[in-house]
């Protein structure tokens, strides 16, 4: 059961306290539980949506979107920014690409990729809520 808790701790900000430091094998097995953690996150977001369904669609979409980012700690957005920066900045140079990915700062392409993905996620959440409410 440790791999599940490792996955939940890694992919969310939920206060999961592991009794020991995970082994490489346990970390590898944790990947198998990523879909389940995604289902849990989706379930929480769905539950919040159902509870506050009477709110205006725009407000509810903003709440759900913010909760989604908060629950995951923005982990995927950080990875997206690193990848976008490295892909554009290190184009054709593998060593430069890896250097850019390790750099803690975020370049303009990284910021732009986050903005675009966040706008799309927010718009899609809004459309889903609006269609359900009508």
Show where each model-derived region lies.
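Hydrophobic alpha-helical transmembrane segments
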Residues: 1-73, 89-96, 103-134
């Amino acid at each position: 059961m440790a791999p599940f808790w490792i996955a939940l701790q890694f992919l969310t900000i939920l206060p999961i306290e592991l009794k020991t430091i995970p082994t490489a094998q346990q970390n590898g097995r944790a990947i198998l539980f990523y879909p389940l953690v995604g289902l849990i996150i989706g379930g929480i977001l769905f539950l919040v949506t159902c509870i506050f369904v009477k709110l205006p669609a725009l407000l509810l979409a903003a709440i759900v979107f913010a909760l989604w980012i908060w629950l995951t700690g923005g982990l995927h957005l950080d990875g997206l920014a690193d990848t976008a920066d490295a892909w554009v900045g290190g184009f054709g140079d593998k060593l430069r690409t890896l250097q850019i990915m390790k750099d803690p700062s975020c370049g303009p392409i990284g910021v732009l990729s986050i903005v675009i993905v966040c706008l799309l996620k927010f718009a899609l959440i809004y459309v889903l809520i609006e269609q359900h409410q009508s």
